[in-house]
Curated annotation (Swiss-Prot):
PANTHER family: 30S RIBOSOMAL PROTEIN S13/40S RIBOSOMAL PROTEIN S18, SMALL RIBOSOMAL SUBUNIT PROTEIN US13M. Located at the top of the head of the 30S subunit, it contacts several helices of the 16S rRNA. In the 70S ribosome it contacts the 23S rRNA (bridge B1a) and protein L5 of the 50S subunit (bridge B1b), connecting the 2 subunits; these bridges are implicated in subunit movement. Contacts the tRNAs in the A and P-sites. This is Small ribosomal subunit protein uS13. Part of the 30S ribosomal subunit. Forms a loose heterodimer with protein S19. Forms two bridges to the 50S subunit in the 70S ribosome. GO terms for molecular function: rRNA binding; structural constituent of ribosome; tRNA binding. Belongs to the universal ribosomal protein uS13 family. It comes from Azoarcus sp. (strain BH72). Coiled coil: none annotated. Keywords: Ribonucleoprotein, Ribosomal protein, RNA-binding, rRNA-binding, tRNA-binding. GO terms for biological process: translation. GO terms for cellular component: cytosol; small ribosomal subunit.
Amino acid sequence: MARIAGVNIPNHKHAEIALTAIYGIGRSRAQKICDAAGVVRSAKIKDLTESDMEKLRDEVGRFVVEGDLRREVTMNIKRLMDLGCYRGVRHRRGLPLRGQRTRTNARTRKGPRKAIAGKK
């Protein structure tokens, strides 16, 4: 398995798909990386030369991916919580942020229902 940005890239997949194993790289960004590196999108990772892999590593290195991106997202959420703004309060309480209703639904964000004693 090849390693790019500290992630093992699957050998049996096409370059375009294999790059999506890296956190922060989706299909469209993977296509742009392949084009910029001059690598054929449909080429399997195991068939690429070491120079092709080096080009891919250089192109991926231009983006914020993996640990740095996770840290950045976490810090952004922490900043909102420290500010005490509406979105930060919703993060702190574990409720939806974007205006969804919470009287019913919102179970994914709120977690499983809490049993109410004496109900029935």
